[in-house]
Amino acid sequence: MSHIRHLAQQCRDAARILATLSTDAKRRLLETMATALNTDAATILAANAADLDAARTQQVGTAMLDRLALDPQRLAAMADALRDIAALPDPVGQVTRDDRRPNGIHIQKIRVPLGVIAMIYEARPNVTADAAALCIKAGNGIILRGGSEAIRSNIAIATALQRALRLASLPETALILVQDMARHTMLELLQLSDLIDLVIPRGGEGLIRFVAEHARIPVIKHYKGVCHQFVDASADIEMAIRLLIDGKTTRPAACNALETLLVHTDIAPRFLPAAAAALRPYGVQLRGDHATCTLLPDVLLATDADYAAEYLDLILAIRIVPNLDAALEHIRRYGSDHTEVIVTADPAHADTFVQQLPSAVVMVNASSRFSDGGALGLGAEIGISTTRLHAYGPMGLDALTVERFVVRGQGQVRHCPPYPPAPRR
């Protein structure tokens, strides 16, 4: 048995124990995990500093450094997030259907854990803690395979969380961190369909494509966020600028940050100069089509690749469109089914925008930054699914469970042949 198969088998065995834990036991475990992060803060931050030094040596971009970096405030927020997850309602055991059929059988649909979830991700060490906590809260085992750029941070975080499992007299193999960064090890992991029930890739386009193409396990992709804001002709200009600043500048490296601004031609002469002036203090680089460059001479001319880009940086692509249909067509062509925003005072246009786009989250007169599990009332999220399966959009605890039927009867049979069978003649 290979090493990675052995680890997955151990996680599978541990997951059976997690699936039987009471809500109170899981709450205490997650609170202990949060305390372990606080206790190991110095060790975790030192490991993260080493990761950051290595990343700077390799001259990675500012967006990657931001996703990788931890500080005392971010680490404290990670621990607080675990306490918040501990306090969330437990989805396991929830009855989603309760029915009695005419023949007397009692039918229920009940949420149960998925089993073992593999999380493959890049850069963000907070995902190590968040994903582990969410999966364990939902009664699942978790196999984590982070990126090489965060390996020291991830080991330090996982070590703290595994110690909490031991303190709770639970197998630490309920949480596995794969430390072998070789591509062939990840490839082997993706073949273990008999031991792993779901794989969630979260990272760059190359990683997600690799996982989707090679996995023999069901995959829920957390694809790139090419998010748009369309400013309709009837839009309130002040509102549109406020949403634009929030969506682009507050955390440009987030997957729910705006990447492209679409503007109706009727409002463009009034809106775009004001929007450009509002964005200037934040250092946002603007790239626009020819019509935009006519209104804003300092703007760089956008290429086709700009409209498909997830910048994760202070760069914004702009296009002026003649109508709502043109905006929808642009989003269908370049979007990633993540999050789209319309700013409009026309209810019919808002309804058309919502109905015509397949994106996981559609906002009407609200910031793209609300495309987040906490902001949408899920309490926490493991990511934002762009795969149209049972989980689409921000994935909370419910998305880490499945529903199964439990049927209780008093000896009912569907067909009733003679019993014992009549003797053959």
Curated annotation (Swiss-Prot):
Keywords: Amino-acid biosynthesis, Cytoplasm, NADP, Oxidoreductase, Proline biosynthesis. One of its GO terms (cellular component) is cytoplasm. GO terms for molecular function: glutamate-5-semialdehyde dehydrogenase activity; NADP binding. InterPro entries: Ald_DH/histidinol_DH (IPR016161), Ald_DH_C (IPR016163), Ald_DH_N (IPR016162), Aldehyde_DH_dom (IPR015590), G-glutamylP_reductase_CS (IPR020593), Glu-5-SA_DH (IPR012134), GPR_dom (IPR000965). GO terms for biological process: L-proline biosynthetic process. It holds the Pfam family Aldedh. The keyword Cytoplasm applies. SUPFAM superfamilies: ALDH-like. Transmembrane segments: none annotated. PROSITE patterns: PROA (PS01223). The keyword Oxidoreductase applies. It catalyses: L-glutamate 5-semialdehyde + phosphate + NADP(+) = L-glutamyl 5-phosphate + NADPH + H(+). It is found in: Cytoplasm. Pathway: Amino-acid biosynthesis; L-proline biosynthesis; L-glutamate 5-semialdehyde from L-glutamate: step 2/2. Signal peptide: none annotated. Its main location: cytoplasm. Its EC number is 1.2.1.41. Belongs to the gamma-glutamyl phosphate reductase family. Catalyzes the NADPH-dependent reduction of L-glutamate 5-phosphate into L-glutamate 5-semialdehyde and phosphate. The product spontaneously undergoes cyclization to form 1-pyrroline-5-carboxylate. This is Gamma-glutamyl phosphate reductase.
